């Protein structure tokens, strides 16, 4: 009986954590940067905020290559605000070697990501990757 109770509790915990996953979590394909390179950013919860790590890089020809930024956290401190809005984060742009104040907006399978300096923003639309 004790084993059944523990198994049920473990299954319930697993289901609850899966149900609480943030909608922006997962793999996202970026648009090409200024150098023509694109990538896959894997977004996950880092505490109570979202962060994203570069997990794959492709050159302008679409070939996978070993980027010096592989495994680097590209997005961090994104605060979920509800209704697909994420604010008060930071984003690193490898093509410019700069970090910007950032925001994200999720709509279906598209994630609009913007990095800003003062009131000037540069944005991309990322699409959900398999």
Segments and roles (model prediction):
Residues 94, 101-104, 110-123:
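Short, exposed beta-strand-loop hairpins at the edges of beta-sheets
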Residues 7-15:
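Bacterial N-terminal signal peptides
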Residues 17-21:
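Sec/Tat signal peptide C-region and signal peptidase I cleavage site
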Residues 24-25, 29-100:
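Central antiparallel beta-sheet cores of small beta-barrel/beta-sandwich binding domains
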Residues 1-7:
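Positively charged n-region of N-terminal signal peptides that target proteins for export
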Residues 44-49, 105-111:
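Short, solvent-exposed coil/turn segments at beta-strand boundaries
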Residues 129-130:
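Short, solvent-exposed mixed-charge patches
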């Amino acid at each position: 009986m004790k084993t059944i109770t523990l198994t049920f509790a473990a299954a319930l915990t697993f289901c609850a954590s899966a149900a609480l996953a943030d909608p922006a979590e997962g793999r996202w394909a970026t648009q090409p940067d200024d150098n023509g390179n694109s990538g896959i950013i894997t977004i996950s919860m880092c505490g109570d905020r979202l962060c994203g790590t570069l997990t794959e890089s492709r050159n302008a020809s679409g070939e996978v290559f070993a980027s010096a930024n592989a495994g680097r956290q590209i997005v961090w401190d994104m605060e979920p605000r509800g209704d697909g809005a994420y604010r008060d984060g930071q984003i690193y742009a490898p093509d410019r070697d700069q970090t910007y104040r950032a925001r994200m907006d999720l709509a279906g399978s598209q994630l609009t990501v913007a990095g800003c300096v003062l009131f000037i923003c540069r944005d991309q639309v990322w699409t959900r990757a398999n």
